Each structure stands twice: as structure tokens, then as C-alpha cells.
């Protein structure tokens, strides 16, 4: 498979730096380009703000400054064998956009870089990302442990849809002790799943605690980092193994595209637990016996998700959606900072209002998760979402919603406009109290 990564080939001229001058730079800051995908430069020593703009795609002389939209389903080859090598996963290249596309891969490379991962894949929605992230290493007869305070759609995915596929899930309190979380594990448990900041309860995850329990039981920790974004938190730095996103939210920021992402840290040792993860460590007969961990190393997990799940299930985002997502990513740090500062002011206002009985926002010093936010989030920031309860209960909430003038009632968060949602009436309507 073809993956957007940095491989040293030839030096390129960029920002007035000649190839001869760049040759004297340390390897960590040398401007280099990839042999297969033009224009990628190593961004490890750059600030996240710079990565949001430059990572994933940097044009060479005479090439477009903006990321091109490769609006094509197929790709030309000159011989039968050339294309055959691609289908056997023995060569790099593109052959069908349902699996991979140059526009999509450039944006995936950027998100992987922002999270500090080794590889990433984009999906057509955040729900598709979470489905693939779990299903890539689970099958009928397996078991998942998940935090109970997660997005309602993800809760139903794990509790209902996966059950139909023969995969059971046990939910644990996010505030549970390590011993209590570990008690939920079974011999067939394959995944521990949680959200960095729970949607919509805004519970802040103790990532190190969950990572320790996961690794003590020989499973990876998958963390949905949608609400925090890599601007505020990078879960890999705290022990998480795989990160997912609904890129529809802050990464897009303008409510113009639906998408998701899965990023692999490359840190989980699948071979050490090969008896559990045989889909990665044993021959895949649908690809002439390829063993993903042997052939693709740290990129085994993402390669399997791309070559197997995308092949069979689809859920690839359109190149145009990825182009729009990339535009959003370029301003992500600026927007997240302003989202958080605005949310902080509103949370403080609501917290002092007589008709508000409770405010959930970890930026408030008295919030239950304030200390965790200070530990895991940059500058203690969390996100631009606030949840609060009115003194009149559900009826008061409905009256409040129906009286809004400027704010919009919508099933969304993290756009440029203020949106208000009543979870009990909308996103979590299928759940009980």
C-alpha cells in the first residue's frame, strides 16, 4: 500500500533555501521530498501551527501551492504486472479511490503528524472511524471495554450494532479505579475505548490510568480525541495507542464536510499478543497470505484497515471533502484557542446565573475534572462545548431552546456559529436516564 510518510530522496528548494544550503542542515530540519508523493517535508521540529499549514503537502517548483483535488476514481498503469503488484500489496501506488487517493492521503499525513502518529486513514464520518478502529482488531466472539460517558452514537455502536456482529461490550465508569476497570476485562477482550473529552458530558479522561489498565491486560487503548483536538491534547504522549476523530467537528470548523480519521501511534506490539490479534500477525488469505506486522511493521494496523476494511466496506471520504477538511486544518490552532476562550467566558456567566443549576466545563476551578484538564490539556483548555442544567428541568430546557434568537438549534458542534443542542431530545434520545 502507498502511505504518506517522509522518506529521504532528493533535497528541494523551499522558502529561498537552495539544495546546497539545505545539505548543511541537521537531518531533523533538512528539507527533503518523498520519492512517491511529492512535496512532503519532515515537520518534527516545527510547531503545531506550522504543521497545520505545511504538513502533508508542500509543492515543488511549478506545482500548485494549494493541495490539488484528485477527483478521479482510477489511475493509469502501462502493464498488467504493474497493477497486479498493487493488488498483492507488493508495490506503492494508487489504483482505486475507494481504498486511497492522493488528496485524501495528504490530509491523512497531516493529521498523523499533528497527533504524532506513524500513519493515518481518513473515513467518510467519525462513526465510520470508530467502527473501523474497533472492527479492525475484533471479530465475532470478542469483547470490548469502553467508558460509559461517550457520544450516544458511539455508545449504540458498541452496545447494539457490534452485539449483532457477535462482539460484546462492557461499559465502565470513566471515574472508576484501575482495579474496577480491570475487573471488566475478560480473556477475549481486545480493546479499551474512551473519549478524551466525553460528548456531551465533558468528562475529562484520565488517559494514563486507562492506558495503564489497557496495557496491563495486553490490549490497545483507543481514544476519540474529537473534542480536544491535537491542539489541546495529544493522547499518544500519555499512553494511548490509537486515536480517532470526527473531522466533521473542530478540524473542519465550518460545518461543510463530514469525515473521520484513525491515527496509529505505532507503539502497540501486536506480535507480542499475536494469539489475540491474528488478523494482523497471521497470513491474510484474501491477500495471498500477507502478514501485516511482518510486511508493514509499525504501519500494520493502518495498512490492514485500508487494504481490508476499505476494500470490503467502503466509507472513503470524497477528495473534495478532504480538500475542504484541509482548509479547516490550516486555521485549527487559531480557532480552537478562540473557541475555548469564548466557552470559558460563557461558562463563567452561566455558572453565576440564578436559573442555571449546574455547569459542566472543566475550565471552571470548581469543576470535578478541572485538575485532569490542567494535567492533560494545553494551558488547561478543554474545548468550545459547554453543557449545563436549568433549574426547571427538561421543560425549562425546551423553553430555553425554543426562545433562542442568534444561536442555532442544530445537531452539531464546533462550527463558526454558536449551536445549541438538547441531548435528551436529540443525540441521546434512544438512551434511558
Question: Which residues fall in each region the model found?
Answer:
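Conserved PLP-enzyme active-site core in the AAT-like
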Residues: 44, 52-58, 120-352, 360
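Short Gly/Pro-enriched turn/cap motifs at secondary-structure boundaries
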Residues: 59-61, 251, 314, 376-378, ...
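Intrinsically disordered, low-complexity segments enriched in serine/proline and basic residues
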Residues: 5, 9-11, 16-27
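Conserved N-terminal alpha-helix of the aminotransferase class I/II PLP-enzyme fold
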Residues: 79-131, 153-161
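PLP-dependent enzyme catalytic core of the Aspartate aminotransferase-like
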Residues: 1, 31-32, 40, 159, ...
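Short loop segments at secondary-structure junctions
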Residues: 74, 265-268, 390-393
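Conserved C-terminal alpha-helix-loop-beta "cap" of PLP-dependent enzymes
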Residues: 336, 344, 348-351, 355-433
Amino acid at each position: 500500500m502507498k502511505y504518506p510518510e517522509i522518506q529521504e530522496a532528493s533535497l528541494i528548494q523551499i522558502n529561498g533555501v537552495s539544495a546546497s544550503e539545505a545539505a548543511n542542515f541537521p537531518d531533523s530540519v533538512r528539507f527533503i521530498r518523498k520519492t512517491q508523493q511529492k512535496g512532503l517535508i519532515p515537520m518534527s521540529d516545527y510547531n503545531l501551527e506550522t504543521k497545520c499549514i505545511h504538513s502533508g503537502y508542500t509543492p515543488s517548483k511549478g506545482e500548485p501551492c494549494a493541495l490539488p483535488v484528485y477527483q478521479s476514481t482510477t489511475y493509469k498503469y502501462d502493464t498488467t504486472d504493474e497493477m497486479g503488484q498493487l493488488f498483492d500489496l507488493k508495490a506503492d501506488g494508487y489504483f482505486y479511490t475507494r481504498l486511497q487517493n492522493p488528496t485524501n492521503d495528504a490530509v491523512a499525513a497531516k493529521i498523523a503528524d499533528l497527533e504524532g502518529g506513524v500513519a493515518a486513514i481518513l473515513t467518510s464520518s467519525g462513526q465510520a472511524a470508530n467502527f473501523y478502529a474497533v472492527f479492525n482488531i475484533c471479530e465475532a466472539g470478542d469483547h470490548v471495554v469502553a467508558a460509559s460517558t461517550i457520544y450516544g452514537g458511539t455508545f449504540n455502536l458498541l452496545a447494539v450494532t457490534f452485539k449483532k456482529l457477535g462482539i460484546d461490550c462492557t461499559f465502565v465508569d470513566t471515574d472508576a479505579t484501575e482495579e474496577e476497570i480491570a475487573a471488566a476485562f475478560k480473556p477475549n477482550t481486545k480493546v479499551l475505548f474512551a473519549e478524551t473529552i466525553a460528548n456531551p458530558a465533558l468528562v475529562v479522561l484520565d488517559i494514563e490510568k486507562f492506558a495503564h489498565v489497557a496495557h496491563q491486560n495486553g490490549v490497545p487503548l483507543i481514544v476519540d480525541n474529537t473534542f480536544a483536538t491535537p491542539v489541546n491534547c495529544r493522547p499518544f504522549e500519555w499512553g494511548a495507542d490509537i486515536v480517532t476523530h470526527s473531522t466533521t467537528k473542530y478540524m473542519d470548523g465550518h460545518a461543510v464536510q463530514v469525515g473521520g480519521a484513525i491515527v496509529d501511534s505505532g507503539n502497540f506490539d501486536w506480535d507480542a499478543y499475536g494469539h489475540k490479534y491474528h488478523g494482523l500477525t497471521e497470513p491474510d488469505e484474501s491477500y495471498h497470505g500477507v502478514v501485516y506486522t511482518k510486511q508493514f511493521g509499525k504501519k500494520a494496523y493502518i495498512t490492514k484497515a485500508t487494504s481490508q476494511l476499505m476494500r470490503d466496506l467502503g466509507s472513503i471520504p470524497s477528495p473534495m471533502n478532504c480538500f475542504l477538511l484541509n482548509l479547516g486544518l490550516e486555521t485549527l490552532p487559531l480557532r480552537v484557542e478562540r473557541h475555548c476562550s469564548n466557552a470559558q467566558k460563557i461558562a463563567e456567566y452561566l455558572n453565576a446565573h440564578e436559573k442555571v443549576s449546574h455547569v459542566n466545563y472543566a475550565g471552571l476551578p470548581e469543576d470535578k475534572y478541572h485538575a485532569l484538564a490542567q494535567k492533560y490539556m494545553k494551558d488547561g483548555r478543554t474545548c468550545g462545548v459547554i453543557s449545563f442544567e436549568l433549574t426547571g428541568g427538561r421543560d425549562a430546557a425546551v423553553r430555553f431552546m425554543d426562545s433562542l434568537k442568534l444561536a442555532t438549534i442544530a445537531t452539531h458542534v464546533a462550527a463558526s456559529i454558536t449551536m445549541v443542542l438538547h441531548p435528551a431530545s436529540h443525540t441521546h434520545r434512544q438512551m434511558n436516564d
